[in-house]
């Protein structure tokens, strides 16, 4: 037995080494609190439809708090389900063309709950290499055999499913990938899944509100809405201007998740304010479907300004390579009144650190002028090697 004697905090001394290594690599992250009135132009948030401060969305949250209180009070299975939760589930399912819906406390929890409940030790999971971290973590927790497929490689998927020994299989993909904004080949993936008896689970976090008729998502756009072997997961925190997540699928899947999804069973239900805000945002989107089209129009404007590839979603990536260059560029934008995202490893592969711009339907002419001026200056400076 080895006896280790040290100071009170010696057990965590290793964190100092980790922090130094992160700083040396340009990968240290810090929090920056927003003020109530932020004077910068926003190209960093996921408020794609510009609904976060919409009066109806704010009123929806306030009204729900007045009727139900500040919290859900318990698990969805005990006291945490209100009639508003059930209304939101039906409204979301109807909007995307699913048979039923189940609301979770976050999009992350929805993915963890759905994947672990629909897999297990006797299943195979094939997960796209570009999947969101929540799906990656779900794979780790699933106890299934996991195969990571090269990004958008349908032939690899076909071979993995054909060669499996497991009776059950679950295929995971984002509809719109968050780093580059590219689209999954959903129609081809579904054909392969149908041929080989696999379930296709699609994370529509960046698809709903942007892709499909009136923002119904890429699954709907590809004609896969309501298919019994397709499970859609979604977040309420992007286009729907709130917080929380949902699984939209068949009634059979919903019933199973209520019994088996641990992130549903053992977590407190979504707060009433978030439910009310999401319902109001969905109502606005139904009434104003042109918001979805406007997001893609603004994304094309951003691509033109930066010289990026024509976008298929709200996400426009400007790859700069080195993480310190990307951080400096983001800081230079901020100092000139423009807030942009900055993606570095492990969010993206080594050597592909980038500015990540997210389009918003409500960007106006004055804001676009600021965007064009600042991005032109900053990108010119970075590419010329001018220090921040």
Q: Residue spans of the language-model regions?
A:
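N-terminal "arm"/small-domain region of PLP-dependent enzymes with the aminotransferase-like
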Residues: 3-71, 198
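PLP-dependent enzyme catalytic core of the Aspartate aminotransferase-like
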Residues: 51, 55, 59, 63, ...
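Conserved N-terminal alpha-helix of the aminotransferase class I/II PLP-enzyme fold
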Residues: 59, 63-106, 299
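Conserved PLP-anchoring active-site segment centered on the Schiff-base-forming lysine
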Residues: 114-133
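Active-site phosphate-binding strand-loop segment of PLP-dependent enzymes
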Residues: 147-202
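Active-site PLP attachment segment
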Residues: 222-256
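Structural motif of enzymes handling amino- and sulfur-group chemistry
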Residues: 269-288, 294, 298, 308
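Conserved PLP-binding catalytic core of the aspartate aminotransferase-like
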Residues: 294-337, 347, 351-352, 359-361, ...
């Amino acid at each position: 037995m080895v006896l280790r004697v040290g100071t009170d905090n010696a057990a965590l001394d290793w964190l100092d080494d980790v922090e130094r290594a992160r700083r040396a690599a340009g990968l240290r992250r810090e929090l920056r609190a927003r003020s109530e009135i932020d004077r910068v132009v926003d190209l960093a948030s996921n408020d794609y439809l510009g609904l976060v401060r919409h009066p109806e969305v704010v009123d929806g949250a306030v009204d729900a708090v007045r009727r139900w209180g500040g919290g859900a009070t318990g698990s969805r299975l005990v006291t945490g389900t209100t009639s508003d939760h059930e209304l939101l589930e039906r409204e979301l399912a109807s909007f995307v063309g699913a048979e039923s819906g189940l609301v979770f406390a976050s999009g992350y929890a929805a993915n963890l709950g759905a994947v672990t409940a629909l897999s297990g030790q006797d299943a195979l999971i094939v997960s796209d290499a570009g999947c969101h971290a929540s799906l990656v973590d779900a794979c780790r927790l699933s106890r299934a055999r996991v195969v990571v497929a090269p990004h958008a490689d349908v032939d690899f998927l076909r071979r993995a499913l054909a060669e499996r020994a497991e009776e059950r299989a679950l295929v995971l993909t984002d509809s719109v990938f968050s780093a580059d904004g590219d689209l999954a080949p959903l129609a081809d993936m579904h054909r392969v899944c149908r041929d080989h008896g696999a379930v296709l689970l699609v994370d529509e976090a960046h698809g709903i509100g942007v892709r499909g008729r009136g923002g119904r998502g890429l699954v709907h756009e590809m004609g896969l809405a309501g298919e019994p072997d397709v499970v859609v997961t979604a977040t309420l925190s992007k286009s729907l201007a709130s917080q929380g997540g949902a699984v939209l699928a068949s009634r059979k899947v919903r019933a199973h998740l209520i019994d088996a999804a641990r992130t549903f069973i053992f977590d407190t239900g979504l707060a009433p304010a978030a439910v009310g805000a999401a319902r109001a945002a969905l109502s606005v989107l139904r009434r104003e479907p042109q918001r979805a089209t406007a997001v893609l129009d603004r994304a094309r404007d951003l691509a033109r300004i930066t010289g990026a590839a024509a976008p298929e979603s709200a996400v426009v990536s400007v790859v700069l390579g080195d993480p310190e260059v990307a951080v400096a560029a983001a800081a230079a934008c901020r100092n000139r009144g423009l807030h942009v995202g900055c993606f570095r490893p492990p969010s993206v592969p080594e050597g592909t650190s980038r500015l990540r711009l997210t389009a918003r339907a409500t960007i106006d002419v004055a804001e676009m002028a600021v965007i064009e001026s600042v991005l032109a200056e900053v990108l010119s400076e970075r590419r010329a090697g001018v220090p921040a």
